Every structure is written in structure tokens, then in C-alpha cells.
Amino acid sequence: MNAQPLVLHHYTSGTGLLGIFDSDSVWASLIHSQNDTKEFEHAIDEARTYLSTLRAADADAAHMAINLALSTSLDRIARLNIYVACFSAIEDSLSQWRGYCPPGFGYSLGLFGEELERVAGPQGFRLVKCIYDHAEQRPIIEQWAEYALQELRKTLPAGADPVQHVNDKCPLFFPGFAAFAPTMKDQAFRDECEWRLVGIVPSNDPRVRLRAGKSMLVPYVPIDLGLATNQSLVWNIRIGPTPNMELASNAATHFFRRARVRNGIGLSTIPYRDW
């Protein structure tokens, strides 16, 4: 895993911040509900493009059939129940205030990355850094595709149907794809400098719940933080642009009763007004 920044920031509304402290958790939402409409599909599209390039250069009928079947099987990967909780390496970001917080009612919660990784790991979540550069994404995708093809060709029994062989064996390669695909985002989002907690959670897992989204119900999984006993997790609370900075700051001190906030409360310095 890449060395994470000392502190990662979760941008949310005042209601969301209350929810974090009241439930002692952050919520990881189903990846397909994120504001990037191409979430997860981006890596699938890139993999299919590369597989198509390899297929065009291969005259072996069995190899071509395996390649095409693997490309088709990516639809099954897209249906995996992958959940993500999002953070930014930037503490006071205009794009984050505008994108993830309601007008005049935004907060960011600063959490120590190493400690966040420690508490989330036993719950099935990894802390990963998002990749926006296509030049960095491509080798990862190509390595996965080449390895999968090599293994599928090597294990194809004599006289066996290549398509059925791929259908039987391709789930072995899904975890590898699911490990990197949630980190790959369109470069239009690079200013977010995003890190994520990522986990695969079956649909029948009792932790799965529903919350109200802007236009639909969104499945989510709470990731327990242990704020009352963990003295090393919370770094700060920052209040976003609001017409009542002093009142908002005074009210936020009540969170000190719930958890140790090591660097106290900060105020956004961005001269932005959205009320």
C-alpha cells in the first residue's frame, strides 16, 4: 500500500458529522452510487480495450475465444458488491466543500490514516489511494489481463470448450481485478486527491443497510471507529464556509465530549460564499 498522508479528511454535512459521532462509524456506500458515473466501469472499459487489442493480434482460434470470453466475463465483476468510504488528502478544498457539502453547512473530519487503516482492516476494508493518471493505470490493467489470459490458456484441457473453461475459471481472477479497479478514476476528478476504504461485502451481510440519497436509496455498510476509546484517530474538525463561523465553532466543541480531537477545531480560510 502507498504510504498515506498523515491525515485524511472526510467532507460531509453537519447532519453527516452528527451521524458519524452518533453512530461511531463512517459509512461505506455501494461504489455504483458515487458521483463519478463511470465508477468501476472505467477500469472495465480499459481492460476490454486492451483485450481487444491483443485479440486482433492473435490468430489462434482457442486463444481468441478465451480472450473474448474473458472480456465478456467482466460484466460479472461489475456486479460485485464493492463498498467505498471516501477521504481527501486536502484539508481545506474548495472542490470538496462545493461537491460534498450543502451550502453553508459543511464540515470535514480529519482522521489519522494509519489509525484508520488499523481499525477498518479487521472489518474487511483496505485503505487505498486513487489513481487518476491513465499512464499509471494502464500497466496495472494490462498486467492483470496478460496474467489471466496466460493462466486460462495454460489450464485449458485438450478438447475442452474455451468459453465454458473461462466461465468456470474466471472467478479466480475477479479478486485481483476488484483490488485495483476501485482505485481508478477519471482524470477529471484528480483535484480531489482521494483515498478510499474499499471492501467487498456480500448482499446478504447483516451489516448492509439503506440510506436516503438525492434520487434513490443507497446501500451502505457502517465501518466502526471506536471513537470513545480510540485516542489516536481524530486529528481535527474543520468548519466549511458558513455565515456564522463563531457560532458554528462554539457548537462543534460539544464533539470533544465524544472523542479526543487532537488538533481541535479549525475554520475554512477559503473566501467562498454559497448562501
Where are these regions (language model features)?
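Partner-binding and oligomerization surfaces adjacent to conserved cores of proteins
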Residues: 1-275
